[in-house]
């Protein structure tokens, strides 16, 4: 059980928020008249009161100084998994991300040289709307047993990132994942740059805590093909069987299947798999691995037991 100590809003992003006694929350939008409301995954930001109190030992800050919407006493949000649900009266919030990248013009960082929001803040979407008031109780709700697996899709393409080439592989992956029962939380097109890819893989695994990340492109022999190296750089454990199975299947179709350098790894509880860049190869590989992939994804997430056959 927690307690809502403060509600804070602002009309502009990148600024401190100011306390208000109550707020109206709208489903799939956020707090009415707050700058961060919208149809995205970071509708409401939350900070544990204990984290703010620890910061206040160095320098005094008001509630809302870190851009947080809700200050809650009694919960250490960083120790709870993404998809955790909370009730404040009739309002239901679902946690969607832990931490974030702090932009350079963050007001509190300019003033104090530090901002705890990237380390300690969490974000949520509004599942059920209503009105909340300072002093309300917050309850942690049981996690629904039938939550679908969550995925993200990253396309690697210099030309695609510049809008010079249509991305056909990314939408195909989304279509196939959706048909298999996954919820695709995010899609993006990145240039073939290791730094950008590593940052997004880390964010997807650590911040969004998706169960599966599928990349497409950048697995060949071109000097700009850096997807396997960037993927291995963020990995905790190797999961080579998936990539090996895809190469084996591709070789049954074309001898050029041996030229794929794609890898499959684990970062925390997230499985990351490199797919080829062409839509044809994407479809062939996904059709081959998807039926067996779910069990491995669920084991990595702690949702299923061992793989041993009986």
Task: Give, region by region, the residue ranges found by the protein language model.
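Solvent-exposed alpha-helices and their adjacent loops that cap or buttress functional pockets
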Residues: 15-18, 36-39, 78, 115-118, ...
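Mid-chain, well-packed structural core segment of small domains
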Residues: 74-108, 237-264
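Well-ordered alpha/beta subsegment
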Residues: 121-144
